[in-house]
């Protein structure tokens, strides 16, 4: 089993301090490896290594035939290629996704823009779009300052479900760690609830199925 962990917070997590979403995603990956000791793990930390935005220069590079690209264009496309290769190889994907201003982080959006490539991770057919990243189990660890689960103000879940599904990843589970900005006790309770959700997934055997 190959696991890809994507940390998308703007904050690092090290020595027990920093991004709660990255911490919980790491805990989930560790639990997955407990059940699959031979599993390999790739961690894509977008705080430590931010991915560049999809700007005009990047678009020009992508739409230039490979044999006609400048060295700078080839280097830019190679950055996206690396992310695509990681997600193509993964059997299980764990995404740490904190809520920033009611949505996903800029870091996660840049990652999505990099992996969404026509004729590579999705294609248009006579019957409509078809995602090409099929057969993957995806866990999204959501951290929020307040309470947004099942609320109209939760813009993360609908967007992520749509864009991941568009790319072929329809087996998606969301794990919620809310109330992170509501004081130490509420924050700790939110983390505890997320850990309970992780434990339940593992007990049911659906974390890797």
Curated annotation (Swiss-Prot):
Binding-site list for FMN: 9, 19-21, 143-146
Enzyme Commission number, as recorded: 1.6.5.-, 1.7.1.17
HAMAP family associated with the record: Azoreductase_type1
Free-text cofactor note: Binds 1 FMN per subunit.
GO molecular function list: electron transfer activity; FMN binding; oxidoreductase activity, acting on NAD(P)H as acceptor; oxidoreductase activity, acting on NAD(P)H, quinone or similar compound as acceptor
Keywords (A to Z) from UniProt: Flavoprotein, FMN, NAD, Oxidoreductase
Highest rank taxon of the organism: Bacteria
UniProt cross-references to InterPro entries, sorted A to Z: Flavodoxin_fold (IPR003680), Flavoprotein-like_sf (IPR029039), FMN-dep_NADH:Q_OxRdtase_AzoR1 (IPR050104), NADH:quinone_OxRdtase_FMN_depd (IPR023048)
Task performed by this protein: Quinone reductase that provides resistance to thiol-specific stress caused by electrophilic quinones. Also exhibits azoreductase activity. Catalyzes the reductive cleavage of the azo bond in aromatic azo compounds to the corresponding amines.
Catalytic activity: 2 a quinone + NADH + H(+) = 2 a 1,4-benzosemiquinone + NAD(+); N,N-dimethyl-1,4-phenylenediamine + anthranilate + 2 NAD(+) = 2-(4-dimethylaminophenyl)diazenylbenzoate + 2 NADH + 2 H(+)
Family classification: Belongs to the azoreductase type 1 family.
Protein name per Swiss-Prot or TrEMBL: FMN-dependent NADH:quinone oxidoreductase
Organism: Leptothrix cholodnii (strain ATCC 51168 / LMG 8142 / SP-6)
Assembly with partners or alone: Homodimer.
CC cofactor: FMN
